[in-house]
């Protein structure tokens, strides 16, 4: 309890631990929630051990009985205590969603018996596998469980399995996440499984609107900077016309999907135009370069400042184009699988299984057991091109670092240090 209060205080919150110094969900039902909750959402600690079986039994909320008890009269893994609690808290139409250790979907012995009873209620709605590195400092994969006591009658003997382990955005070497649009896509699978096609249709419209707005934003940004390219952006004109025509004539998301390849070419040409401009200016004498800069922008004071300003603005445009391409990529991911909005099992991604099929799999709730292995999807990024870009960028950064070090060394010499 003291640790809990301290944790709340660190986050600037006042707390009252209702169970006092003995606060422990396994041994106390302080809030008396059994059968009272419309919704339950939780991220409990995984794989807790040494839980006293007798105290846990006395605390109740175990509609399917205790998990396995060892010779020391302890529950050696409390995962199915949590799962039982969350189910027990729901009222007759309640819904639950919680994070759980990946191993819990297929654990054996008494866990399997509890899982069997749980599945036979017809209230297990969806199971989702999640990739590694979705938690800070915890690299292990996990699963998301969803219960729904108010499921439609036609879905009661079915469970939706989603394997999202290959679908995520890399934040850095040790952290992954779902982007806003990836979460919407995963939601869309559930909508279609439930027959909520209108939500899917609205999402397609949201994609269309977002891409149109992104286009307007980066096109306006390019318009303001294009004059600064001083004729080096001529190759961009026909591409810009093509892109504009597709956007203006589009009526739905499918008509915008071809933009992805065009925007990739557009970004490449934009970077090439900037490079050509910079190489020309860098090749001039200092005074000539200044005159050249002022001929393009009267407010320019030096070539270096002008180059930095133009480069920064072009990088911003390229970044906006990349963001637009990301939205298009996610729209394509969704529409290629579900078209205008009919649920279908997708190899390696999702599968609706009946309770009979789950029984055949020995009551496993591991999505990968049902969805099978996904086919390898082509990446629209060329590996060799990307590695070349990275190599060039590293060389540029190294060159800039060397110049900076020379400047620092020279300054130290002047200071006599």
Specify the residue positions occupied by each region the protein language model found.
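S-adenosyl-L-methionine
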Residues: 2-35
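A conserved structural/catalytic subdomain of Rossmann-like adenosyl-cofactor enzymes
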Residues: 34-413
